[in-house]
Amino acid sequence: MSRLLRGAALAALTLAAVSTAGAAGAQSYNRLVVFGDSLSDNGNLYAVTGGTTPTSPPYYQGRFSNGPVFTELLGFNVGRYAAGAPVTGSINYAFGGARTDSQASPPGMRNQLLAYTGAGGKFGANDLVSILGGANNIFQGIPAAGASANPQGSIAPVALSAAADMKFIVNSVAAAGAGTILVTNLPRLGTTPQFNQGAGLPASPLADYAGTTFNGALLSGLMATAAAQPNTNIIMMDLYKISDTLSGNPGLFGLTNAKDACFNGATVCSTPDSYLYWDGVHPTAAGHRLIARLANDYLYYGDLGAQNAVLGETAWRHREDALDGSTASLSGR
């Protein structure tokens, strides 16, 4: 039985993650392969648009943030695991704006996987594969759903279809021989600046509904995949679980503002490292460092360790200081 399935059972189906911290920590990764959207894009959309999207600066070298994204920071905690940036042979197929489906431009996540395998790409037992997506499906579906007679009934198929895409991608990667897959669910979308204020506020409940619908279906899909692919460790990093904690008490994580966007489309705030959000939906460099630390904890400690680390301020601070020190030059801090 896969670790994801055991972890979900032990947590009474509340969270899918590795169940044995020691086993997770012992895993060695030689390469990182990334499929996803703007939260993982390290400059791919910027390159294909001739350096026009996103506008850099103020965006950082084609990232949808003011610094490196979390997948570039994995592995900077010395002694944990080998995947990270820079890592020889690592591959990033993520594109800003990508949905989970087979859209042509920017390449949807199904197409990202097809492009990788079509070019002869393979997966190995020591690969760490990061898969994160679904938000763009929901963002693009909310306007029409919100204007319909049944907003929840209209957005639910969008969320469920995105989760089905994710299941397909994860299952395909596992069947192709990947040793470990880190799948990230969606945070509580209603707490992002795009939906927690201004014109987007009325859509906040619908965004939350869509996100939880997606997350529930994603978990079910991952459990089924875990049962069918016993040789792959499938780990779900639960961003939703920490959303309210982050919003309610950002100081625990070294932040002062988890509500507003640092960059409002015209001006940049004076203290971006104290903000969780860079723009309406994307994390700041500080936010990405936080996600990277959380990912490290999930990969090394498993669910229980990750949960305790997030909620334990002292333990969190020790790891935060270590990671910040090792990534300062990369992030320009």
Please give the residue ranges for each predicted region:
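Conserved active-site regions of diverse hydrolases
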Residues: R3-L4, L13, V18, A23-R333
